[in-house]
Amino acid sequence: HWQDDTLYSVITRFGFLGVAHNTDVLSEKDAASYSVFSDARVTGKLGHFDWHLPNLGQMSLAAGNGSAYDIDAAGWDKVQETTMALRGQVGGFFDYGGTFSSLNDGQMVAFAGIGDWITGVLEKNGAKVRTTIPEEGGLQWTESFSIGKGTQNYEMARKWIQWITSPEGQAKSADMAAYPALIPSKKGWEVLNATNPAEAKRQNMVLGQHNAMDMIREGRIQYRQLPVQQGLEDWNDFWSDYKGA
């Protein structure tokens, strides 16, 4: 990440947020639109990861806003209307652990606000869950490393960043046990495809075919960010109202 000519951090991993779903109940075709959240099969079984930014960003895309977070008053009204229309579908608002358990045991069959960073962990352990990026688009989170000013371990930090951005480090990072992620290094993709082709395929990181990078090029992915034309407190206050409705 650069500001003017100054490098502040180095991107190492990223991932997409879309429609997380139980594949025994909802197919990838079903999950190809956020409208699946209104499906009768989801009634009482729609979960929310309890953080307003990814959820309302997704609802903004579902409402037809061209930009998920840079929206005017009319666009913000549409976000609130679209979100409130789902309230009767919701089975709960969950923290990190609750999101895992409620998806794993089938308590929730669809989830908003998350992506493969959660469903991938479950899927690799045999759970029938997956994240599908819907036609309306998905969001991207990004993980980067910086070296803190005044650090006492500069050389160690520098060596870590050098390793994690190397092809081997990138391939290891993609399949991290805590949560899987996409990687930006083409050479890292090559190593991953050679050493762990199943995971490369699962994460749509196979070279020479339509893959995750094409979704970005096609404009289907937007960055998760702060609201531009509303205050953060406006989004947070609405989220609290939604939860209490």
Predicted ranges, named:
Residues 1-107:
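Extracytoplasmic ligand-binding site segments that recognize negatively charged/polar headgroups
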Residues 211-245:
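Conserved C-terminal helix/tail region of periplasmic/extracytoplasmic solute-binding proteins
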Residues 148-216:
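Mature extracytoplasmic/periplasmic domains
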Residues 18-25, 60-64, 141-156, 172-175:
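A bilobed periplasmic-binding-protein/Venus flytrap-type ligand-binding module shared by bacterial periplasmic
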Residues 16-17, 24-27, 44, 52-56, ...:
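Solvent-exposed loop/turn segments at secondary-structure junctions
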Residues 76-86, 125-149:
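Periplasmic-binding protein-like
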Residues 92-93, 109-114, 130:
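Paired acidic/hydrophobic, glycine-rich loop segments that form the ligand-binding mouth/hinge
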Residues 112-128:
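A ligand-binding cleft/hinge motif common to bilobed small-molecule-binding domains
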